[in-house]
Structure formats: C-alpha cells, structure tokens
C-alpha cells in the first residue's frame, strides 16, 4: 500500500535496490506531450550515483519507455518506465542479516512485515527515488508548457547554510546544474569538510523555488499546497524537516515583522515580500513558491556504533568498507526534491482546471 502519489496526475513506483530493476507507472498524463528516452538523461544524471562525493555504485540509469508513448508522443494512457539495476553488490550485505544496522529501516520493516529484504535497504533504499526523478521529467515538461519553471539546489551542508531564496533565472539554473554539488554555497568549503571527515557523513538542506505560480493551485483544508508538498518531500528517504517561506523562523517573529503587505501596480496586485512562501490559505497567489527540506546525515558511516544482533547480543557495528554509500545524501536529493515539487504542482494544476466551468 501507499506506493502511489498524486490524484489526477499520479505515479506508482515499484522495485527494490538490489532487484533486477525499478520503475514507475504514470497515470493521468495528457496526450500529445513530446517525450523520448533522451529527455530523461539530464535529470537522471543529477541523481545518479558513482559521481564526485556520492555513492560509488555505478548505475547508468537509462530509462526505457514501455508504454504510453507512440512516435515520441504521449498517448494519454498509462506511461510505464523501467530502470535496470546494473551494479548490484548484494554480497556486501550478507553478513548483516543477523544484526540491526543503526539508522536504517530494516528494524521497522521486520517489525511491520515480519520479513524484510536487507540487500542494500530493499524498498526503503534511496534507489527508489530514481523512479520519482524519471516521472518528474514528464511533470516538468508539462509545467514548462504552461510557463512554470522550478529549481532545487543544495542550500545547506553540515554547518554551511544559506537561507536566502534567489530569484529564479536561466543563469541561476545554469549555475546550479554545473556545480558538482548543485549548490550556490562555496564549493571549496564543502570539499574541505569532506576531506577532513572521511569516516563520517553530513546532513544538508535542499531549497526549492519556482517562477510565479498561477493563482489557485491548492485546495482548502486537506488539499493545501504546502500540506501536499510537505507530504511529498517528507516521503523522500532521509528527509527530516520541511518548511515553506519563513517557516520555523516565523515562530520567532512578531506579526508586524512577518506580514506580507499587498501592493498594486499596472500588472495587478502582488506582495511586497514573500514570507508566506507563495501560498495563503494553502492556495498559490501568483508569487514564487519557496521552501526547504532538511536531510539527516547518512546512517552508513565508517565510525563504530553500538547495536545488537537479532538475538539481543550487544555488538560494535561498523559499516563494511566494501559498502557503497553517500557522504551526504542531500547532494543527490536535489534532483529528487525538484521532481517531487514538479509532480505536486502538475497534479494541482490539473485539479485546478476542474474548479470552474
């Protein structure tokens, strides 16, 4: 259950980290959208392991379109995408079958189901997010056709952090996409932290921004734009916090300091500031959407940690040297955050078209 996300534009992901393949089925995509396997390459490359300061697992992450596309056009029927797992190394996990890995979902999965696939995290692995990124490519194409641009970037790495939301532009997108860390932070400072802590891992923050959204995205009460975004973002493995606009810092403000004043000019009514993050009453108001997602440090580290065998015997657990893990999962989570943003916005955009005759 709960492998589906979205209402009108919905996705269902499937597969495990060390299975033969993972994939996603997209339902609700309008017909006539141009789509080819090459369209997936840039986004998949940003999430793909085996790059600088990410997991050394080598996965090409080539997307195969199985259905829903004919002559490079979507047909309006379900689109099925397949991504093969090419670099599986399950032997690294065989000796871990009898102990609990600190910080991993294995203990929870075994408690819930009575059985769990322990190879590389199974269904709980961040490998699953490759399917979301693939689906997000289709969502982004729809958004761009409606004049909506989106971007996610690494805004926090360990103690390094920037809370500013820059204005979205082509040059900003290019700057983020050409950075090895997908960030506006000083790259040499990130590299120094990694070099000084080779046996440890780091948490991070991923910010997301959009061009001004159409007024009306989001539904009252349980379908609010920030609420749906929070659900999508917090479903990403290792996500531990979400905020929109001023977020948690708004709790330390006075009303006079927080309120966004309305202004009007020849282009219409807008806000003087955007501490609300682009939504009032859970509905977009024509402003850019701005938010952040916090990610915990990767649990797989080379430093020893206390744990127990499944029979309760205490042990000193250490991640095996042959294991392949990210020093900071937030780096590759940039592409996933952007995908979840795109998937949420497309679904709400299509819902909004049903609001008025």
Swiss-Prot record:
Residues that coordinate or bind FMN: 123-125, 281, 296-300, 324
NCBIfam families: aroC, PRK05382.1
InterPro entries with a match to the protein in the record: Chorismate_synth, Chorismate_synth_AroC_sf, Chorismate_synthase_CS
Protein's job: This reaction introduces a second double bond into the aromatic ring system.
Pathway of action: Metabolic intermediate biosynthesis; chorismate biosynthesis; chorismate from D-erythrose 4-phosphate and phosphoenolpyruvate: step 7/7
The EC number(s) this enzyme carries: 4.2.3.5
Pfam families per record: Chorismate_synt
Subunit description: Homotetramer.
Biological processes, Gene Ontology terms: amino acid biosynthetic process; aromatic amino acid family biosynthetic process; chorismate biosynthetic process
PROSITE patterns attached to this UniProt entry: CHORISMATE_SYNTHASE_1, CHORISMATE_SYNTHASE_2, CHORISMATE_SYNTHASE_3
PANTHER family cross-referenced by the UniProt entry: CHORISMATE SYNTHASE
Stored CDD domains: Chorismate_synthase
Superkingdom, taxonomy of origin: Bacteria
Primary enzyme class: lyase
Co-factor(s): FMNH2
Record text on cofactor binding: Reduced FMN (FMNH(2)).
A GO-annotated cellular component: cytosol
Keyword check for S-adenosyl-L-methionine: no
GO molecular function terms attached to this record: chorismate synthase activity; FMN binding
Membership in a protein family: Belongs to the chorismate synthase family.
Catalysed transformations (reactions): 5-O-(1-carboxyvinyl)-3-phosphoshikimate = chorismate + phosphate
Phosphoprotein keyword on record: no
Protein name: Chorismate synthase
Keyword entries, A-Z: Amino-acid biosynthesis, Aromatic amino acid biosynthesis, FAD, Flavoprotein, FMN, Lyase, NADP
Residue numbers binding NADP(+): 47
């Amino acid at each position: 259950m709960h492998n589906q996300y979205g209402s009108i534009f919905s996705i269902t992901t499937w597969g495990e980290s060390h299975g033969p393949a993972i994939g996603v089925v997209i339902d609700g995509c309008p017909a006539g959208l141009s789509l080819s396997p090459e369209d997936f390459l840039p986004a998949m490359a940003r999430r793909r392991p085996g790059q600088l300061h990410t997991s050394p697992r080598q996965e090409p992450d080539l997307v195969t379109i199985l259905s829903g596309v004919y002559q490079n056009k979507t047909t309006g029927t379900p689109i099925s995408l397949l991504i093969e797992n090419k670099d599986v190394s399950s032997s690294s996990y065989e000796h871990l079958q009898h102990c609990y890995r600190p910080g991993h979902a294995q203990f929870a999965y075994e408690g819930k189901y009575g059985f769990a696939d322990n190879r590389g995290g199974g269904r709980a692995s961040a490998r699953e997010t490759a399917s979301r990124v693939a689906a997000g490519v289709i969502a982004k194409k729809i958004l761009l056709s409606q004049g909506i641009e989106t971007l996610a970037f690494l805004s926090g790495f360990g103690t390094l952090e920037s809370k500013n939301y820059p204005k979205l532009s082509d040059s900003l997108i290019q700057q983020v996409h050409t950075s090895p860390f997908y960030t506006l932070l000083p790259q040499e400072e990130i590299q120094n932290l990694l070099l000084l802590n080779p046996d440890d891992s780091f948490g991070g923050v991923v910010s997301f921004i959009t061009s001004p959204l159409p007024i009306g995205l989001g539904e009252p009460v349980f379908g609010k734009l920030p609420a749906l975004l929070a659900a999508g973002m917090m479903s990403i493995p290792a996500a531990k916090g979400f905020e929109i606009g001023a977020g948690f810092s708004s709790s330390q403000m006075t009303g006079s300091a927080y309120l966004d004043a309305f202004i009007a000019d020849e282009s219409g009514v807008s806000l003087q500031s955007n501490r609300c993050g682009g939504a009032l009453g859970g509905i977009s108001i024509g402003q850019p959407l701005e938010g952040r997602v916090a990610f915990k440090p990767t649990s797989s580290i080379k430093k020893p940690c206390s744990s127990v065998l499944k029979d309760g015997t205490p042990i000193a657990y250490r991640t095996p040297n042959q294991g392949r893990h990210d020093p900071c999962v937030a780096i590759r989570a940039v592409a996933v955050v952007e995908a979840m943003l795109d998937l949420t916005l497309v679904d709400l955009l299509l819902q909004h078209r049903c609001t008025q005759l």
